[in-house]
């Protein structure tokens, strides 16, 4: 799903080249099938059933994201959701609790949509995440604002002139 949201946000206000525009248009196929069939596909997968819904999800994850990655410039497919994942890899809890890339990125998408003030879309994804057990809070990925790496980064952000230290209660 991140390919769609990162791609559309990162390319906003640009006049994309033809290849980029194709990838941006195709990026909806990285999110729409997951939101439409994801819950059923998870149940089917857990029951070891190959169904059209599960096939749609597999194709969205493997084929659609592959096409988008190949069509658009790298700056369009790297954004806040993946930056958050990269940052969380330094937390011992990420490895200790075996949090998967997609779990952490799904939380990052929520944060990214909030930062972009896309509240209605964020709320739609929030409901989806809850429906299939994906993270919706820092605690769901066993991260705490007071964890030393997060505390250090909050301090750096607050001293860089970029604004006040984020409140832990807002995370």
Task: Label each region the model flagged.
Residues 1-4, 101, 161:
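Short, surface-exposed linear patches
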Residues 1-13:
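Conserved anion/nucleotide-ligand pocket segment
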Residues 13-15, 43, 135-140:
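Charged, low-complexity surface segments at secondary-structure and domain boundaries
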Residues 16-128:
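Active-site segments that bind and position negatively charged phosphate/pyrophosphate groups
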Residues 118-171:
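C-terminal charged capping/lid subdomain of soluble metabolic enzymes
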């Amino acid at each position: 799903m991140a390919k769609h949201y990162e791609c559309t946000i990162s390319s906003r206000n640009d006049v994309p080249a033809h290849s980029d525009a194709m990838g941006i248009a195709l990026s909806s196929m990285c999110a729409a099938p997951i939101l439409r069939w994801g819950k059923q596909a998870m149940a089917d997968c857990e029951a070891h059933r190959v169904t059209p819904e599960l096939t749609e999800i597999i194709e969205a994850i493997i084929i659609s994201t592959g096409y988008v990655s190949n069509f658009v410039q790298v700056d369009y497919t790297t954004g806040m959701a993946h930056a958050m994942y990269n940052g969380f890899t330094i937390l011992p809890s990420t490895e200790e609790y075996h949090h998967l890339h997609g779990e952490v990125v799904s939380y990052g998408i929520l944060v990214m949509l909030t930062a972009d003030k896309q509240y209605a879309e964020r709320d739609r994804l929030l409901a989806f995440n809850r429906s299939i057990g994906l993270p919706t809070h820092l605690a769901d990925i066993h991260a705490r604002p007071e964890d030393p790496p997060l505390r250090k980064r909050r301090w750096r952000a607050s001293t860089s002139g970029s604004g006040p230290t984020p409140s832990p209660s807002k995370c």
